[in-house]
From Swiss-Prot:
Family affiliation: Belongs to the HD-ZIP homeobox family. Class I subfamily.
Organism expressing this protein natively: Arabidopsis thaliana
Tissues expressing the protein: Widely expressed.
Protein name: Homeobox-leucine zipper protein HAT5
GO molecular function annotation: DNA-binding transcription factor activity; DNA-binding transcription factor activity, RNA polymerase II-specific; protein homodimerization activity; sequence-specific DNA binding
């Protein structure tokens, strides 16, 4: 036999079966082979990672029990669902009562309630998420509409502000200058002076109003009355100069023989 051959000796007893490799050195002997086979069966019976369905149908997590995994019947699941809707928390006394009523072990009932609560929380989170998502979408839509309304109102405010500023600028413009009463037109003043000179040069007997602003009219009084001969009086020269006027030599006093009843003589002024 070749040294590297592998064979199994069936002649050995059940408890002392041996494997030989090559030159007949024992590799695994006795109870070691049985332990390896038990480990393989255990791994096949219960995988390391269990799905939610396996947890839902599994009875409990005690690996020391040799029986196979048992699935719950439809009636048992229905009764457990009704009990869960009544109260999702499982008390020890209630767990024992349900186990006796359903023909299950208390550990099976506890595991089922634990898995059912996990799924219920997941469903509740999904419902809450959907509700919050719909609320968020609605708020986002309302926000967009509010932003559009805000932009529209802002544009209207800007337009109204520009119109108001235009009206204020128009109102603040200075009005047209109106001439004051004291500020007369020089042309009007010259025309008035020429009109006055024309009246004086026409030879009429009308009187003219003379003031300090027209001294040339006072100095030329004699030119307007050339036919009147000045009358000499006994007044002083200084008084004559101070009291001189345009009509000083025109009126000459005359003595009338008539007397009033008091005997006083009245003086009459004659026009030459």
């Amino acid at each position: 036999m070749e040294s590297n051959s592998f064979f199994f000796d069936p002649s050995a007893s059940h408890g002392n079966s041996m494997f030989f490799l090559g030159n007949l050195n024992p590799v695994v002997q006795g109870g070691g082979a049985r332990s390896m086979m038990n480990m393989e069966e255990t791994s096949k019976r219960r995988p390391f990672f269990s799905s939610p369905e396996d947890l839902y149908d599994d009875d409990f997590y005690d690996d020391q029990l040799p029986e196979k995994k048992r699935r719950l019947t439809t009636e048992q699941v229905h009764l457990l669902e009704k009990s869960f809707e009544t109260e999702n928390k499982l008390e020890p006394e209630r767990k024992t009562q349900l186990a006796k009523k359903l023909g299950l072990q208390p550990r099976q009932v506890a595991v089922w309630f634990q898995n059912r609560r996990a799924r219920w929380k997941t469903k509740q989170l999904e419902r809450d998420y959907d509700l919050l998502k719909s609320t968020y979408d609605q708020l986002l839509s309302n926000y967009d509409s509010i932003v559009m309304d805000n932009d529209k109102l802002r544009s209207e405010v800007t337009s109204l502000t520009e119109k108001l500023q235009g009206k204020q600028e128009t109102a603040n413009e200075p009005p047209g200058q109106v001439p004051e009463p004291n500020q007369l037109d020089p042309v009007y003043i010259n025309a008035a002076a020429i009109k006055t000179e024309d009246r004086l040069s026409s030879g009429s007997v009308g009187s003219a109003v003379l003031d300090d602003d027209a001294p040339q009219l006072l100095d030329s009084c004699d030119s307007y009355f050339p036919s009147i001969v000045p009358i000499q009086d006994n007044s002083n020269a200084s008084d004559h100069d101070n009291d001189r006027s345009c009509f000083a030599d025109v009126f000459v006093p005359t003595t009338s023989p008539s007397h009033d009843h008091h005997g006083e003589s009245l003086a009459f002024w004659g026009w030459p």
